[in-house]
Amino acid sequence: MLYNSGIAWKKSPNKRVSLFGMSGVGKTFISNILRKSKEWFHYSVDYRIGTKYLGEEIIDTFKKEAMKVSLLREHLLNDSIYISSNISFQNLSPLSGFLGKPGDVDMGGIPFKQYLDRQRKHHSAEIGATIDTELFAHKAQDIYGYKHFISDTSGSLCEIVNPNNPNDLVLKALQQSYQLENLFFSCTIFLECEHVFFLREGNKL
């Protein structure tokens, strides 16, 4: 972290933070707390993946399943109904449902080859959505006037970067996101369960 004390952190007029850690550790939990303060812009990499990059794929998957049901098939073909994704920061089920689980189709699984194909698509989408952090860091200040920016990264960030490569495209993009203006201080926080407990007890960043 670039801050050597809580006082240094609090004195920063504009903060840019990237949270990273395994899925379920509390990145979105913390981001939601900050967003509700109305001073932080919350950028969710997973939400971006499930909307811009894989949104159409997700809906097409739902439609393909619906076409197996005669009643739904009839209504889809004559445009009587439509199917869409209701993905949100808090509900990423459409994305996880699309990725699926390899296994017996009769038990809700998908063929392993199809699973790998979807994982490859997600990998590419995750790279694109993470690189987009810089774009939204600009938007947060330039369009919406937010003082602070928090990037809620995906749980598999470590799988799309090479920390030993100084020219890694994703890491360079993240670095740029936090060096756009000299006004901004930045840091990256690795979350562990203790951090989430700290916030749940009513403490503030």
Language-model features: locations:
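Conserved glycine(s) of the Walker
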Residues: 26
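Hydrophobic anchor at the beta1->P-loop junction of P-loop NTPases
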Residues: 19
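Pre-Walker A adenine-sensing motif
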Residues: 1-11
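Hydrophobic positions on the alpha1 helix immediately C-terminal to the Walker A/P-loop
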Residues: 30, 34
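ATP-dependent small-molecule kinase phosphotransfer cores
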Residues: 54-164
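The conserved Walker
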Residues: 23
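Short beta-strand-centered segment that lines the nucleotide-binding/catalytic pocket of NTP-utilizing
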Residues: 39-54
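ATP-dependent NMP and nucleoside kinases share a basic, alpha-helical "lid"
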Residues: 134-143, 152-204
